[in-house]
Curated annotation (Swiss-Prot):
Protein family membership: In the C-terminal section; belongs to the class-I pyridoxal-phosphate-dependent aminotransferase family.
Key words, A-Z: DNA-binding, Pyridoxal phosphate, Repressor, Transcription, Transcription regulation
Name this polypeptide is given: Vitamin B6 salvage pathway transcriptional repressor PtsJ
Organism of provenance: Salmonella typhimurium (strain LT2 / SGSC1412 / ATCC 700720)
Its job: Acts as a transcriptional repressor of the pdxK gene, encoding a pyridoxal kinase involved in the vitamin B6 salvage pathway. Also represses transcription of its own gene. Binds to the ptsJ-pdxK intergenic region, but does not bind pdxY and pdxH promoters. Among all six B6 vitamers, only pyridoxal 5'-phosphate (PLP) clearly binds to the protein and acts as an effector molecule for PtsJ, inducing a protein conformational change that increases affinity for DNA. Thus, PLP stabilizes protein-DNA interactions, reinforcing repression.
InterPro entries: Aminotransferase_I/II_large (IPR004839), HTH_trans_reg/aminotransferase (IPR051446), PyrdxlP-dep_Trfase (IPR015424), PyrdxlP-dep_Trfase_major (IPR015421), Tscrpt_reg_HTH_GntR (IPR000524), WH-like_DNA-bd_sf (IPR036388), WH_DNA-bd_sf (IPR036390)
Induction note: Represses its own expression.
HTH gntR-type domain sequence ranges: 4-72
A GO molecular-function descriptor: DNA binding
SUPFAM superfamilies named in the record: PLP-dependent transferases, Winged helix' DNA-binding domain
Length: 430
């Protein structure tokens, strides 16, 4: 059934059988030695074909149990709420729409000069502002680039430095969009546990020793748990990463403009390739698809090549709109109020739950994390009967399901938080 004399020919033969349906998900491929004997080729030729199948996501190795055809990706959970739900939606991870800027106020400030092919990809004003903002966040002054959001930046950075099949260390539990991006880009997620102080250094070192070539780290407002790096934890991570200079370090500081937690440096001086990403989605709204990336010069060059091969640049209209918002003194004042409001939501829910003997750590960001001992479905269903739609935590798990609930607090007032706490208590004691 399988034929070919070279690794490419064997790969193409197996691929055609998958397309034709003669090889299906979970079907075992012949042992390397057996197929090599049948085709009268070297075993290394068959092994190379199988390795390419695995890298392409068409097969998976089961170790001593051989190599099997990989099934089509199963449906995955997506970030965002349900606009059609009759329930009070606390599942979406969205900012409060009432706290986003009125963009119409800034349209008159946009440049009337058309931008053409060959123009600088980053607007000069935004470039200068971003360089000042990120100067203290990087080991040395970084090159500034603009992407269509944080996940767009992370995917392009990984594809620039890594190959399909490479392992990437990520927090466990992990942001849904990061999980999905790694999956569809063909990378392998290597889970690293987090606690109230952030990613655990000893678990990260284990992942690096097992072959992870990059790490994606959230320094503040980790999604879904809300944890932020403590100074002690950041120093431990930085010291550990100094021993692995070849590892690509990507810092996803997505909540930088609204975080109530101080910035903690993690990138070591010895790290060869690094990037710090700060997006405006939670600040100006998810529809302003823009993230600012500061990186070392080699990483920036690779990123620009990937941008040039695709979208080339993020619309200068969006860039100018973001710059107008972020340099408006009135909106800066509103940002301060929003930062205090989101932090107060976290504290309020923690105190309200404490009255019922339920302890959670107040986090940072728009989401609260309620850890559970068992699967969250029953608790989420009980809360739904009380009128609340929350996000079940299992979808955020990388190595295993993460038992808990992610609850978006951004739109809740004090009275609603008190009611929610009472309903959580009832759901946990049903």
């Amino acid at each position: 059934m399988i034929d070919g004399k070279t690794a490419n020919e064997i790969f193409d033969s197996i691929r055609q059988h998958i397309i034709a349906g003669t090889l299906r998900a979970e079907d075992s491929l012949p042992p390397v030695r057996e197929l090599a004997s049948e085709l009268k080729v070297n075993r290394n030729t068959v092994a190379a074909a199988y390795k390419r199948l695995i890298t392409a996501g068409l097969a998976q190795s089961l170790g001593r149990n051989g190599t099997v055809i990989k099934g089509s990706p199963s449906p995955v959970a997506l970030e965002g709420g349900d606009p059609h739900t009759p329930l009070h939606d606390l599942s979406g991870g969205n900012p409060d729409p009432q706290r986003l800027p009125d963009l119409s106020r800034y349209f008159a400030r946009l440049s009337r000069t058309p931008h053409l092919y060959g123009d600088a990809p980053v607007s000069p004003e935004l470039h200068a502002w971003a360089a000042r903002w990120l100067r203290d966040a990087t080991p040395v002054a970084g090159e500034i680039d603009i992407t269509s959001g944080a996940i767009d930046a992370i995917e392009r950075l990984l594809c620039a430095h890594l190959l399909p099949g490479d392992s990437v260390a990520v927090e466990d539990p992990c942001f849904l969009s990061s999980i999905n991006m790694l999956r569809y880009a063909g990378f392998s997620a290597s889970p690293v546990s987090v606690d109230s102080e952030g990613m655990q250094p000893e678990k990260l070192e284990r992942a690096l020793n097992q072959g992870a070539r990059a790490v994606i780290l959230t320094p503040r407002a980790h999604n879904p748990t809300g944890c932020s790096l403590s100074a002690r934890r950041a120093a431990a991570l930085q010291n550990m990463l100094a021993r692995y200079p070849q590892v690509v370090v990507i810092i996803d500081d997505h909540f930088a403009l609204l975080s109530s937690s101080p910035w903690q440096p993690v990138i070591a001086q010895t790290t060869q390739h690094w990037a710090v990403i700060r997006s405006v989605s939670k600040t100006l709204g998810p529809d302003l698809r823009l993230a600012i990336v500061a990186s070392d010069s080699a990483t920036s060059a690779k990123l620009r090549l990937r941008l040039n091969a695709g979208s080339q640049w993020v619309s200068h209209l969006l860039q100018d709109l973001v710059y107008a918002c972020l340099t408006d003194p009135e909106y800066q004042h509103r940002l301060t109020q929003t930062r205090l409001f989101y932090a107060a939501r976290q504290q309020k829910l923690a105190r309200a739950l404490q009255q019922y003997g339920i302890a959670i750590s107040p986090g940072d960001g728009v989401n609260a994390w309620l850890p559970l001992d068992t699967h969250s479905q029953a608790t989420a269903f009980t809360l739904a009967k009380s009128g609340w739609l929350v996000r079940e935590g299992e979808a955020f798990g990388v190595s295993a399901p993460s038992h808990g609930l992610r609850i978006t607090l951004s739109t809740l007032n004090d009275s609603e938080i008190n009611t929610l706490a009472a309903d959580i208590h009832q759901a946990l004691n049903r």
